[in-house]
Amino acid sequence: MKIIMCIFGLAALAMAGETDLQKILRESNDQFTAQMFSEVVKANPGQNVVLSAFSVLPPLGQLALASVGESHDELLRALALPNDNVTKDVFADLNRGVRAVKGVDLKMASKIYVAKGLELNDDFAAVSRDVFGSEVQNVDFVKSVEAAGAINKWVEDQTNNRIKNLVDPDALDETTRSVLVNAIYFKGSWKDKFVKERTMDRDFHVSKDKTIKVPTMIGKKDVRYADVPELDAKMIEMSYEGDQASMIIILPNQVDGITALEQKLKDPKALSRAEERLYNTEVEIYLPKFKIETTTDLKEVLSNMNIKKLFTPGAARLENLLKTKESLYVDAAIQKAFIEVNEEGAEAAAANAFGIVPASLILYPEVHIDRPFYFELKIDGIPMFNGKVIEP
């Protein structure tokens, strides 16, 4: 019998000093984010992309604790977590950290929908409640339109109506036993907002052969900036109110440099090494406004990341999930991610990126984000959303 995993993002996480658990989470997330970004970009050639690898971790953590045998071991390897006890501790610490975030609007929520007449395994129910903060609700999947409507309404409520129609009624039927849903919502204001009156249409070079006019925000800002030769790019980090959240933008030096940058970002340590070069300075930023929504088939993406048994009947072995002797597996996994960046700040399921050009007539550099770029939304150094902008 089948299980559906649905994930949607607008996200974040917060932490003070880094503990051992937070270090484990950061390293796990860095590795997972690099792999997932590479796969999602591959599936969306030449398109704007936003994703939240971070929001995939909690449901995979839950499914790891619900599984046994090789399927269990495969999930822990993918999460870069050594055992069940560390998995529980890491995600419990994560939930505490999220609740402590200040200065931005942040919400993380989890819910498990179970087929009418079935119950969660007692131990799994306790872990889902105490570690992941998951709500549980029974629904009649045979009434697929009503069931999808209930799930989608909950999703809309958790994401300020930004993520709609996550679950297709056609994906639900009498064989559906459970739907796992995870949501992360982030809305933050720039610490130093852009003035709307300064926004104007400016050139954006989609490619060497295509230039368009896009609304571009302009402002003199205190940022962290670096030239990053190993990425052949410039990097800027801009803070949100509260100083826990920030947006990193990586702008290739070449108009057609985004593909080469994507290849370099397959290394999960590439970004952290580049960030070591950042220093505080003042710049005049030219940043295009943008809004992106991406729907990702996580079943395909995760399978390409060597998470295969979870989706294979007879091999998933989700024996600790429900009080049933049926053989369960994940039939579908979906993520919808959204981000909007404007003069006020960001509302997200993603992040943004930008580039730099030196100026000779002023004492501080100008940063012209006028070609395809990579972006990342972080909280206390943990990537929550990332993506690329090809055409704002």
From Swiss-Prot:
Major site of localization recorded for this protein? secreted
**Which residues of this protein are annotated with the site description Reactive bond?**
359-360
InterPro entries linked: Serpin_CS, Serpin_dom, Serpin_fam, Serpin_sf, Serpin_sf_1, Serpin_sf_2
**PROSITE patterns per the record?**
SERPIN
Name the Pfam families for this protein.
Answer: Serpin
The signal peptide annotation in the UniProt record is 1-16
Q: What induces it?
A: By bacterial infection.
Which biological process annotations from GO are given for this protein? response to bacterium
Q: Please explain the role this protein plays, according to its UniProt record.
A: Inhibits elastase.
What's the protein here called? Alaserpin
- The species this protein was found in: Manduca sexta (Tobacco hawkmoth)
